[in-house]
Amino acid sequence: MELFIKLPFIQPIPFSIILVTTVSIVLLYSVFFWVTDKKKKRKKAPNAAGAWPLIGHLRLLMNDKEPLYRALGSMADKYGPAFNIRLGNQEVLVVSNWEMVKQCFGNQNDKLFSNRQTTLAAKYMLNQTTSSGFAPYGPYWRELRKIMVQQLLSKQSLESWKHLKIKEMDASFSKLNELCNNNGTGTATLIRMDEWFAELTFNVIARNVFGYQSGGRSTALTNGDTESKGERYKKTLEEALHLMSIFAVSDIFPSLEWVDRLRGLIRNMKRFGDELNSIAGCLIEEHRQKRLQSVSKSDKGVGDEQDFVDVLLSVAEKSQLPGDDPDLVIKSMILEIVSGGSETTSSTLTWALCLLLNHPHVLKKAKEELDTHVGKDRHVEESDTPKLVYINAIIKESMRLYPNGAMLDRLALEECEVGGFHVPAGGRLFVNVWKIQRDPSVWENPLEFKPERWFLSNGEKMDVDYKGHNHEFIPFGIGRRMCAGMLWASEVIHLVLPRLIHGFDMKAASANGKVDMAEMAGMVICFKKTPLEVMVNPRE
């Protein structure tokens, strides 16, 4: 017989229902408290001291005396290879250890940290939603990245554009010779080599991307004025990159975007972003017109002078370009490749020359290697570079000490653990590449510039590359968002530096014969703070 509980004025309830309900409630409470207790027990990385109310460790980003990666490197010495800092109300896990990097990006885990933090500059100036540099990870990003890597920046593609790269390099070296010879004294000439590197790398990449020719006026690129569209793009890009270095309040406190609006920062970002898109739009339209006029020359449109824009237009014509606005996607790719490729490559060359000038015995050894393998009757060619093992070691050592991407900034796609420490979905991760590449447990005498460290005791070169396979050496980044233009940059660096060493005698212009190695205060990029002034003279 079913048992009932009878209460006055209440309909009788079967005891079985009460029992099931009671057990269910107890189970639900047990699960709730178990989950809550588990969350409480999740291990968190140690919190760095010194956080201020409301803003946390924000002062580290606003420090105009020390780069962020150095400040975080000093904190790693105190708190260990993983610790938390707070930026506003956002907690950031900072890792400075190659084993933890391997956990984040090794094997199948590289997808975990494949998103990036949005920024004010990306939103208003860099076409955030259509750029592979800032678009969220997903089908659109994967398709865009595939086009960049396979059709623009692959080894085969770069080989087809090699003649354009060489033409611009030849023009830049001719200009350097001209500057040296114009003083009429036969003595060394004072040259701002950081500026020369910047001009060379922009000219090379702009020639590949949209057909820009330095030292001349291409009718396709002139605006009817004395200045080509390529030159306008370069000047506007320099201003835009300067704006990116200005701290934006809303990058930390999104609700305070109105502050950046009042400061005029958003207005200026929009202005330069619109100008860059406008110039790129003209370049795209001119390429379209040239392709229509050259229909008889097949799909290339411009014959042997095909460039990146031509390839992207071909992809768009086949409806293979992702997104709803093909022109905006192409504009974004132009901006991403030109800005990302020229500035970082010139910075790598600048640091390499700084180190060589401060270590004349290394420079002397590099010259001897060049004289042995190349001789003195011709300049260095791309086919020579694999044989220049010591110069290749110089380049690796320079990138170890002064990596362009000194800090990687990523967001977790899902909840995970790094080094046993909990990272929530959407959690922010800083990878201190600069610190990892100076880790004394990996690198002997890590602060020394020593190209010889890249050779084994038997003289064979070490099997360590910068393609993300070796987690202790990641100057081009790591994971799915590592530098797409790594191969292009590597080719330029490995040809420009030996050609410069081979063709010119150089020494620091300072009274003490040393180059100032101070770094510019900033967040993620390792730039030289002061100009690189060098006394340059063509070798006899």
From Swiss-Prot:
It catalyses: (13S,14R)-13-O-acetyl-1-hydroxy-N-methylcanadine + reduced [NADPH--hemoprotein reductase] + O2 = (13S,14R)-13-O-acetyl-1,8-dihydroxy-N-methylcanadine + oxidized [NADPH--hemoprotein reductase] + H2O + H(+). GO terms for biological process: isoquinoline alkaloid biosynthetic process. Highly expressed in capsules. Expressed is stems. It is found in: Membrane. SUPFAM superfamilies: Cytochrome P450. InterPro entries: Cyt_P450, Cyt_P450_CS, Cyt_P450_E_grp-I, Cyt_P450_sf, Plant_Cytochrome_P450_Monoox. The chain crosses the membrane at residues 15-35. This is (13S,14R)-13-O-acetyl-1-hydroxy-N-methylcanadine 8-hydroxylase CYP82X1.
